[in-house]
From Swiss-Prot:
This is Pyruvate dehydrogenase E1 component subunit beta-3, chloroplastic. The keyword Manganese does not apply. GO terms for molecular function: metal ion binding; pyruvate dehydrogenase (acetyl-transferring) activity. Residues 1-35 form a transit peptide. The lineage of its organism: Eukaryota, Viridiplantae, Streptophyta, Embryophyta, Tracheophyta.
Length: 391
């Protein structure tokens, strides 16, 4: 049923598209900057190794000197959607209230007026159905973006995301590609209670075939969204509810960020701190205290939750020999547990201390603000962990 509906939608979209519209691969006039800076650091034994990291903050600073414009994070996501929908008539958006209401956090505001109700499609409150419709649309050649009004609601679409979205390319023997983006708000911090404060990274990471990324700044939110839309793989983009109103100057020119590269946030020598999403800011707050105490932490926003950028992570570990992982995900079965396992498998010989991992408590998120804060990692805990690991 989902495939049949998608076929009708595809026919309507392609019929409405301009005859002069160019396919994605044929765009000689587009100037797209793929940001991927490389620099050298000293590893154990004095050898020089190359560190590949997407340095969004450095590039954004450089761009700010020559122009650019300030946007909030949710506006950066919207810019990415508009640019990709203008360029490619197969890009479409599905979800609850994504149309004229503009989405629960206004990421899709104005898109229905610009592109019509067919390409920006309001759906019933039936996550399993519209996720399946998105998979069917992708099978028929469209590039759907499926918004969950809240990431916790996508548990109702877990069957479609797991058995169809993630596995169809494999189970069809490569006959189908599933270029779909699944995105939406999640995370802890707005006193929304247990159901609305879900962190589904731990649920989705075990699904074969899915890529997962988490944005943390307006710059990388736009760059990752554009890259996810262009990917031939199904991509889950995690957005944190407390980061939507972050403001940053981003370039006027078009750019994308690599889906599989981490970002070097702060170079350092004493310990590698790996984090992502909202916890990036807790880590940077802790880093100020640590510097005053004489420590020099290296902070990496891993961004790619699946697969991990083990090149960037490994080069940092070879320099600092100590690792602290900070996440908002649950401790049991979380991203931190998988990352710790990958580090042990690949870089055990470079470690001078046990890997430490700070995660959220394995409890449902409370409503009360004080209790909510107690369930997630705070900057003081990060400072204490670094002091312990560097003894």
């Amino acid at each position: 049923m989902a495939t049949a509906a998608a076929a009708s939608l595809q026919y309507a979209l392609h019929g409405a598209a301009s005859a002069s519209a160019k396919p994605r691969s044929a765009a000689p006039g587009r100037s797209v900057r793929v940001v991927a800076a490389r620099r050298s650091v000293r590893a154990r034994g004095g050898a020089v190794v190359a560190r590949a990291a997407v340095t969004a903050s450095a590039d954004a600073t450089a761009e700010s000197k020559s122009g650019g414009h300030e946007v909030l994070l949710f506006e950066a996501l919207r810019e990415a959607l508009i640019e990709e929908m203008k360029e490619d008539p197969t890009v479409c958006v599905f979800g609850e209230d994504v149309g004229h209401y503009g989405g629960s956090y206004k990421v899709t505001k104005g898109l229905a007026e610009m592109f019509g109700d067919l390409r920006v499609l309001d759906t019933p409150i039936a996550e399993n159905s519209f996720a399946g419709m998105g998979v069917g649309a992708a099978m028929k050649g469209l590039r759907p973006i499926v918004e969950g009004m809240n990431m916790g609601f996508l548990l109702l679409a877990y069957n479609q995301i797991s058995n169809n979205c993630g596995m169809l390319h494999y189970t069809s023997g490569g006959q189908f590609k599933i270029p779909i983006v699944i995105r939406g708000p999640g995370g802890v911090g707005r006193q929304l209670g247990a159901e609305h404060s879900q962190r589904l990274e731990s649920y989705f990471q075990s699904i074969p075939g899915l890529q997962m990324v988490a944005c943390s700044t307006p710059y990388n939110a736009k760059g990752l969204m554009k890259a996810a839309i262009r990917s031939e793989n199904p991509v889950v983009l995690f957005e944190h509810v407390l980061l939507y109103n972050l403001k940053e100057k981003i370039p006027d020119e078009e750019y994308i960020c690599c889906l599989e590269e981490a970002e070097m946030v702060r170079p350092g020598e004493h310990v590698t701190i790996l984090t992502y999403s909202r916890m990036r800011y807790h880590v940077m707050q802790a880093a100020k205290t640590l510097v005053n105490k004489g420590y020099d932490p290296e902070v990496i926003d891993i961004r790619s939750l699946k697969p991990f950028d083990l090149h960037t992570i490994g080069n940092s570990i070879k320099k600092t020999h100590r690792v602290l992982i900070v996440e908002e995900c649950m401790r049991t079965g979380g991203i931190g547990a998988s990352l710790r396992s990958a580090i042990i498998d690949n870089f055990w010989d470079y470690l001078d201390a046990p890997i430490m991992c700070l995660s959220s408590q394995d409890v449902p998120t409370p409503y009360a603000a004080t209790l909510e804060d107690a369930t997630v990692v705070q900057p003081a805990q990060i400072v204490a962990a670094v002091e312990q690991i560097c003894q």
